């Protein structure tokens, strides 16, 4: 889902074990991968190398292999008229079988100056519990294309200040999605991806359901003989009343065999 965070995001990945910390200014991501993401390893299921966008990431890599896993601890920061909104989160994702990935995420909302909060703003607390599943049903080396389907479910929780004054569970978000990625050119150095699906938000208090479409597209240039890339991610949200779009230029640089740094700017 699209987060309302603008600024620069730094992403660091360590193979073996990693922790990620994402601030609107910088973030760290830690990854433990049991298998490398190359498509030419003998005796292992085919897995193509696609550039995964840095802002809206996947549950697991497309074509994930059993045993891959990753911890993420992140934080987003937004300044709003004299107070700050913090969005820390913790997530764990793993491949329980070849091409099948699961993820559990717990996001938080933290406000630094409660007396300045807008009347309708949520209070500090656990924002919800997200669970998701993703299955890669196509990995075609000849076309250098991978496709996946998945489902994300989020149970929304009441803020700390409203515990005891209302329902503990305030809503539920239903988000089925489809992902397609393709490499272009003789060396597949141009990588494109589309991640799209409807989002239905059920508000338990009013029993009302909001619906919108999220379409996230990206294009990256994979620098030959490296894990580096440069590219652009475009996050779009469409409803009957409005169309929102954020452009996110980004770059990823491998600092060494175990560390990757990614930078994202929201425009």
Q: Which residue ranges define each predicted feature?
A:
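Bacterial Sec-dependent N-terminal signal peptides
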Residues: 1-27
